Amino acid sequence: MTTAQQTLAQPPAPAPRSLLTERPFRLLYTAAAVSKLGTAVSSLAIPLVAVVALHADAAQVGLLATLSTVAFLLIGLPAGAWVDRSPKRPVMIAADLVRAAALGSVPAAWALGRLTFAHLCAAVLVSGVATVFFDVASLSNLPELVGRDRLTEANAHLVTTDALTQIGGRTVGGLLLAAVAAPAAVLVDAASYLWSAACLLRLGPGTTPAPRADRRAGIRQEIGAGLRFVWRDPVLRPIALAGGCTNLSIQLSQTVLPLLITRELGLPSWVLGLFFAVGGLGVLLGSRCARPLARRFGAGRVLWLMGLAVAPFGLLIALVDRGGWLWAAALGWLVTTFKVGIDNVVKVSFRQAVTPDHMLGRMNATMRFVLTGALCVGSALAGLLGTVLGVRAALWAAAVGLALVWVPIARSPLRRVRALPGT
């Protein structure tokens, strides 16, 4: 039996009370909620800064979107190796301060009349690099903060908060942008990172000392060790494959749906916004139902059973059209994102539960590299299929991918796992 399987075989310890009543997790939860809310605001504000204040064209706006995520592909794997050598919370605090400075420079330069598109790109890229380190360190810090027996509960709270801030943050952002100029709205995100850093400072440096990584091993060797660890582990490999397939398929849909709904079907843009808002609701509901469903059906079993049950609903998305088919497609999108919410809780908890402390950074970085890479491939594939075969063909390809995401889990030891720590 592997180390991962031995970890999963251990019975979960009872959780006496909600994690939200415990100060350390409450501080982390508050930091995450505030910074995610700020990020949701700036996701609207930054493109508007480019368009309204700097008169950017479509290619420049696309470049900004690319710069916000490309850091995971460029430095994600080295960041994981570096985080494994370092205490996690100081890394998170430093990343928050860097993000606050980078984004805070945008309204400052605008107020002085010195803001340029190059400055905006640099701020987005620097913030993206800091986000890589923050996310990897945050995922790696959670087992230390709450204990491995309460990971599912902790992740359920965090994923729910993420979904709520995605829904509410864009609403707040829209109202804020109606009241102030877009560059000033970016200041909200910068302030949210300062708030997050202040909360993390109150947590202290952490009780677990920095792992004593073999300093004779270079970063390249440590990256290779992380890749091999994920690929050879019977729990992590199917999670990576299923997650990559899910992300690729979701991104295929999200890329072409705006073209199909607004251009080919001629529906107003608010319909598209409402359609995607349904997806945010699905993630929220899935994250809240993850623990009870895992208890009812088994933590491993719920992953592949939900994937199998959701498969037909991906076909409804591909059938989107005017009238009743629009409602059917919205139902398909709701159910599909409901599964994503469950996955975000259960899969992340599995990942954290089976990985030794000294490998957490590299494991999380490898997973983020795979998942972000799948998003990039999905975007490129959507463009290729949409150009050659039409946007409807891209939706059918996404439906096929969504119909297959349960296979890696069903063919792995996860299919027999009933209890995950904290469920």
Residue ranges and their predicted role:
Residues 2-423:
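Alpha-helical transmembrane-bundle signature of multi-pass membrane transport and export proteins
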